[in-house]
């Protein structure tokens, strides 16, 4: 919060605006910045470094895709709501909740629903 007074007039923008800004930043990083770094490294004969810049660019591209998916879910109103029963995981304490939405507050650690995510099944 220390730094927010220097950004956006000290106000915290809405989540969707923050996600759009983040997605735009990631887009710049993979499509322009790291691509340029890779090109310059190749031109200077640093093939391994060029490869690493390209690989990091792909990671940044996946970040942009993730932010855009979150924006889409926000617009659809499904970040914290699904049609059928869903397994929700509290990322603070590990509490499991099954339902269409997570609870407003975790019954174990008392953190708000923003700390819940859909439980991943990839181990």
Where are the predicted features?
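Non-heme di-metal
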Residues: 1-123
């Amino acid at each position: 919060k220390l730094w927010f007074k220097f950004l956006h007039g000290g106000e915290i923008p809405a989540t969707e605006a923050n996600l759009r800004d983040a997605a735009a930043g990631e887009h710049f990083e993979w499509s322009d910045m790291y691509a340029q770094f890779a090109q310059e490294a190749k031109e200077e004969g640093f093939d391994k470094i060029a490869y690493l810049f390209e690989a990091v660019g792909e990671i940044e591209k996946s970040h942009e895709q993730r932010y855009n998916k979150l924006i889409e879910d926000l617009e659809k109103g499904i970040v914290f709501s699904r049609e059928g029963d869903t397994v929700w995981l509290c990322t603070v304490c590990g509490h499991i909740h099954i339902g269409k939405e997570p609870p407003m507050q975790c019954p174990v650690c008392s953190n708000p629903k923003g700390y819940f995510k859909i439980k991943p099944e990839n181990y």
